[in-house]
Design a protein with these regions (language model features):
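Intrinsically disordered, low-complexity acidic/Ser/Thr/Pro-rich linker and tail segments
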Residues: 1-71, 160, 166-211, 369-412, ...
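WD40/WD-repeat beta-propeller blade N-cap
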Residues: 29-38, 80-87, 122-129, 148, ...
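WD40/WD-repeat beta-propeller blade-loop signature
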Residues: 37, 51, 76, 83-86, ...
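Loop/turn segments within WD40 beta-propeller blades
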Residues: 42-52, 90-96, 132-139, 224-230, ...
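Conserved strand-to-loop turn within each blade of WD40 beta-propeller repeats
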Residues: 58-61, 101-104, 144-148, 156, ...
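WD40-repeat beta-propellers
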Residues: 64-68, 90, 101, 107-111, ...
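C-terminal scaffolding/assembly regions of large eukaryotic complex subunits
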Residues: 453-642
C-alpha cells in the first residue's frame, strides 16, 4: 500500500496539502478464495451440540475469511475486507471478537460471527504490525508487536467504548481531521464501518484511552505469546532474545538469551511457566521462566522455524517453517517425527482436535491428521528420531542421506485458493496488462473494465509480450503492483489525467469520432457508478419523503453543504458510463484510498451504498466525478497511431 502523509490543510487553502492516491484491486475469481499466501489461522470451537467449528484465515491478499468446518468440507461464509495491506496475524478475543493486524500499521476488530463488519480500527503502531497475542481467561486483553520495535497491550473493553463526540461534532471542531493546535491526528484513531457499510472516522481521544506500551525493544518484533490469565507476556524478534513482560504495567521482568538468530514464534503453557520459542537458527527451545533459563533445545528442522502449536497439555509440539516440513516432537523424550512435507514454507499452524490446519505461502490451506488429543498414536507408526541439541545435527543427518520419511502423504482436506499474480507488464496501449500467476497461466487484462479479456494458459510470458507489442504512444496514466496477489491499479493526480484517446479508437457508439476521452476520468466514473447511483437514490428518496420536489442539482447541493468540494452546478456532468469503462459486478474490484482524515480504507465498489462521507474519498476524485473537472496540466497527450 502506498503510504502518504496526513491530510493537513493550510489555513488559506480549501484543498488538501497532499493529494491522496486511489487504488483499485482487480480479481477474476470467486471471492470465497484467497489469492495470496495465508499468514495466520485461528480456530473457534463450536458453542453448541448442533453447531460447527469455524476456521479464520488471514492472507497476504489483505482479507480475512471465515470457514464453516464439516468433516469433509469447509465453506467460506464471510469475507472480512477492510485492511489495505497484508494481514499478518489474527486472534480470537472472546466468543465474538476477532482481532487482526496488518502491514497497513493497524489493528482491526470484527464481530466474527456476523457478516464481516469491522467494528473498530486501532492505530498506534508506526510500522508494520506483525504479531498478536490474546489472554484466554481475560479475553479483553490483546497485545500487538511490529517492525517499529513497538509492543502495545490493549484492553479492548476500554478501547472500544462508545465515543462522547460524534464524527460530525468532531468535524465542526476540525474540518480536516486536524486538531486546532495544528498537530496531526490523535495518537489512536479508530475507523468504523457500520452495519450499513457507512465509513466514518472517529478518534478515542475523547475518552482518553491509550494502550500500555511495553518499552525496551530496540529492533523489530516478530513473535508474541500471553498467558491465559493475561499476567505474563513474552516477545521475540531480531534481537535474538526472549523478553518477558508484565502486560498490566508494561514493565520488563527478564531477558532470556540462547538463540543465535531471529526469534519467529513463541508459545506459553496455560500456567505461564513454560515457554517454547522457534528461531531462524532452526532451533526450538524450551524455557522455564521460573528458573529463567533454557531447559531443552531441539534440533528438528534444517531451516528457520516459523510457527509452533502445542497439544492442550503442552506435552508435544508441532512445528513448521522454511524447510517445508511439519514435525511433531515429544518435549519430554525428545522423540521427533516428520508428519508431512509440502511445496511451500509453512507460516502458521492451528490445532482442531485430532487435525492440524497448515497455512503456507500458497493461497490454499491444508488439513492434516495430527492426533492432537493422543499424539502418542502417531509415534506408534515408527520412523521417529531423537532431536539433537545443536542446530547442525539435523543438517548433518540430512546430508548423510537419513532424511526422515513423512508419516502422511496427502492432506485430509484442502481449502483451495486461487493462483496469485507474480509477474506483470503494462502494454503500450496503456489499457491492457499482461500477467502471469503462480500456476504459470498468462492472462491479458483490460484495466479500464477490470476483466480478463484473454486467458492464454501456460505459455511463455516473454513471447506473448513480444507478440502483443503495438507501435502506439500514449502517456503512462497509472501504475501497477501485485503485492496482494492481484492487480492493484494506482491512480495519482494529476498524472493519471494525462492520457486521452479518440472515441472512435475506443469503439464508443453514439459519440463523435473526434471526441477525446480522458481515460482516468471515465475509469473513475465506472468505478464510482454504483456509489453515484446509490447516492442519488438516497438523497432523492429523502427529498421525496420530505415532500421536496427540488431538482437533482439541489439535492446534490444539499448533500455537499458541509463538504470540502465546491460543486460547479453549471458544469456539464455526464454521468453516463461508456462500455469500455463498465466494471464487472460479478467480480467487482475493491477500492483502496484515504480521505481527509488520513486513514486508508478498502471496500468493494458494489458495497458502496451512498452513505459514505465524501471526506473519505480523495478531493480530486470526487471533483472529477461530480463536477467533470480535471486538474490543470501543461500538456495534453492522446493516442497517436504510427
Amino acid at each position: 500500500m502506498h503510504r502518504v502523509g496526513s491530510a493537513g490543510n493550510t489555513s488559506n487553502s480549501s484543498r488538501p496539502r497532499k493529494e491522496k492516491r486511489l487504488t483499485y484491486v482487480l480479481n477474476d475469481a470467486d471471492d470465497t478464495k484467497h489469492s495470496a499466501g495465508v499468514n495466520c489461522l485461528a480456530v473457534l470451537k463450536s458453542l453448541g451440540a448442533d453447531g460447527c467449528d469455524y476456521l479464520f484465515t488471514g492472507s497476504r491478499d489483505g482479507t480475512l475469511k471465515r470457514w464453516a468446518l464439516m468433516e469433509d468440507a469447509a465453506t467460506c461464509s464471510t469475507t472480512f475486507e477492510s485492511h489495505v495491506d497484508w494481514v499478518n496475524d489474527a486472534v480470537l478475543a472472546g466468543d465474538n471478537t476477532l482481532v487482526s493486524c496488518s502491514s497497513d500499521t493497524t489493528l482491526k476488530t470484527w464481530n466474527c460471527l456476523t457478516d464481516g463488519t469491522c467494528t473498530r480500527t486501532l492505530r498506534q503502531h508506526s510500522d508494520y504490525v506483525t504479531c498478536l497475542a490474546a489472554a484466554d481467561k481475560n479475553s479483553n486483553i490483546v497485545a500487538s508487536g511490529g517492525l517499529g520495535g513497538e509492543v502495545f497491550v490493549w484492553d479492548l473493553e476500554s478501547a472500544l467504548v462508545p465515543l462522547s463526540k460524534s464524527g460530525d461534532a468532531m468535524e465542526e471542531d476540525s474540518p480536516n481531521g486536524i486538531s486546532g493546535s495544528g498537530n496531526s491526528l490523535p495518537i489512536t484513531s479508530l475507523r468504523t464501518i457500520s452495519s450499513s457499510n457507512c465509513i466514518s472516522t472517529h478518534t478515542n481521544q475523547s475518552n482518553g484511552y491509550v494502550p500500555i506500551a511495553a518499552k525496551g525493544h530496540k529492533e523489530s518484533v516478530y513473535a508474541l505469546a500471553m498467558s491465559d490469565s493475561g499476567t505474563l507476556l513474552v516477545s521475540g524478534g531480531t534481537e535474538k532474545v526472549v523478553r518477558v513482560w508484565d502486560p498490566r504495567t508494561g514493565s520488563k521482568t527478564m531477558k532470556l538469551r540462547g538463540h543465535t538468530d531471529n526469534i519467529r514464534t513463541l508459545l506459553l503453557d496455560s500456567t505461564g511457566r513454560l515457554c517454547l520459542s522457534g528461531s531462524s537458527d532452526s532451533m526450538i527451545r524450551l524455557w522455564d521462566l521460573g528458573q529463567q533459563r533454557c531447559v531443552h533445545s531441539y534440533a528438528v528442522h534444517t531451516d528457520s522455524v516459523w510457527t509452533l502449536a502445542s497439544t492442550p497439555t503442552f506435552s508435544h509440539v508441532y512445528s513448521g517453517g522454511r524447510d517445508l516440513s511439519l514435525y511433531l516432537t515429544d518435549l519430554a523424550t525428545r522423540e521427533s517425527l516428520l508428519l508431512c512435507t509440502g511445496e511451500h514454507p509453512i507460516l502458521q499452524l492451528a490445532l482442531q482436535d485430532d487435525n492440524i490446519w497448515v497455512a503456507t505461502t500458497d493461497s490454499s490451506i491444508n488439513r492434516w491428521p495430527a492426533e492432537g488429543r493422543n499424539p502418542q498414536k502417531v509415534f506408534q507408526r515408527g520412523g521417529s528420531f531423537l532431536a539433537g541439541n545443536l542446530s547442525f545435527s539435523r543438517a548433518k543427518i540430512s546430508l548423510e542421506g537419513s532424511t526422515p520419511v513423512p508419516v502422511y502423504k496427502e492432506p485430509t482436506l484442502v481449502i483451495p485458493g486461487t493462483p496469485g499474480i507474480v509477474q506483470h507488464e503494462i502494454l503500450n496501449n496503456r489499457r491492457n496488462v499482461l500477467t502471469k500467476d503462480t500456476f504459470g497461466s498468462v492472462k491479458l487484462w483490460e484495466i479500464s473494465r477490470g476483466i480478463v479479456i484473454e486467458n492464454y494458459g501456460k505459455v511463455s510470458f516473454e513471447e506473448k509480450k513480444e507478440e502483443l507489442f503495438e507501435m502506439v504512444s500514449i502517456p503512462a496514466w497509472f501504475t501497477v503492483d501485485t503485492r496482494l496477489g492481484s492487480l492493484s491499479i494506482h491512480l495519482d493526480t494529476p498524472q493519471c489525467f494525462s492520457a486521452e484517446m479518440y472515441s472512435t479508437d475506443l469503439n464508443i457508439v453514439g459519440k463523435p469520432e473526434d471526441d477525446k476521452v480522458n481515460l482516468a476520468r471515465e475509469t473513475l466514473k465506472g468505478l464510482l457508478a454504483h456509489w453515484l447511483a446509490k447516492r442519488k437514490q438516497r438523497f432523492g428518496f429523502q427529498a421525496s419523503a420530505n415532500g421536496d420536489v427540488s431538482s437533482g442539482k439541489d439535492i446534490s447541493h444539499r448533500s455537499l453543504t458541509h463538504s470540502r468540494i465546491e460543486v460547479d452546478f453549471n458544469a456539464e456532468n455526464d454521468a453516463m458510463v461508456y462500455p469500455p469503462f463498465e466494471f464487472s459486478t460479478v467480480f467487482p474490484p475493491s477500492i483502496i484510498t484515504e480521505g481527509s482524515h488520513g486513514g486508508p480504507w478498502r471496500k468493494k465498489i458494489t458495497d458502496l451504498d451512498g452513505t459514505e462521507d465524501e471526506k473519505d474519498f480523495p478531493f480530486w476524485c470526487l471533483d472529477c466525478v461530480l463536477n467533470n473537472r480535471l486538474p490543470p496540466r501543461e500538456n495534453t497527450k492522446w493516442l497517436i497511431m504510427l
